[in-house]
Every structure is written in C-alpha cells, then in structure tokens.
Amino acid sequence: MEGLKELGLMKGNAEDAVREGAHALFYPHGLGHMMGLDVHDMENLGELWVGYDGQPKSTQFGRKSQRLAIPLEPGFVHTVEPGIYFIPELIDLWKGEKKFMDFINYDKVEEYRNFGGIRNEEDYLITETGARRLGKKIPLTPEEVEALR
C-alpha cells in the first residue's frame, strides 16, 4: 500500500484502504496458496477443506480469493505471489461507480491502464524454525534484472 501511495496511485490511510478493500483494484486475488505434488492440486482437494478448516472465509472482493487461513505448519509448501495489475475493465467499473474515491487516484491510475501487470512467484517450504525458499532467488531490482543480460 505504501508503494502505491508513493507512486500516487493511492492516497489516504493505508490501514483504512486495505480494510475497505481499495487495494484490490491492483491485486484482486490472494497472496498465494498451498502446493502439493502439483502447483494447484491442494486447492483441487477443496479450498475450504484444505485451507480453512472451518474458519469463515471473507466475502470481500480480493480477500475472498485468499486460499489459506490456517496456521502454517512445518512441512507445508506454499507459494507467495505478490504482484500488481492494471485491469482496464475493473478500472472502468470502479471509476464509473466512484468506488473508493477517498483512496484511489483514478487520474494517476489512467497513466498505467495499458501496463498490464507483473507478479513475482516464489515457493517456500515451512520448517520448524521458519521457511526455506525452494529454487533460486528471483532478480527483483532493475540492476539485478539487467545483470541477467
């Protein structure tokens, strides 16, 4: 949220914006999901059964796509997928409804409408003492990406 504010895409109190769901214009899904032998096989077992264990699931746009609400345990494998998306149809819908005008700077969003989006995906094994990344570190900064040439 703070990065979106720095770019001028969002404004106002970050906690209020997230609580209301304004951030979902740029990130309309959950942060990641459990993995089994295949990337999505755990959710195919039944998202509520695997990731919620009787806990209530949010109905808020964006948050309702979160696939895990149970505490992480050693041995779990989880993907973490932060990103940012500019979906023209969603921008038009929310802007037309004047949705979250206190939090979203739609004039600035228009400058990015044709960008598309980008997502970073990394997979982690939950251990007794924390988490271990599976695979190599993905380059994130412009300098790290340029160094791949």
What are these regions (language model features)?
Residues 1-149:
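Active-site neighborhoods and metal-handling regions in enzymes and metal-associated proteins
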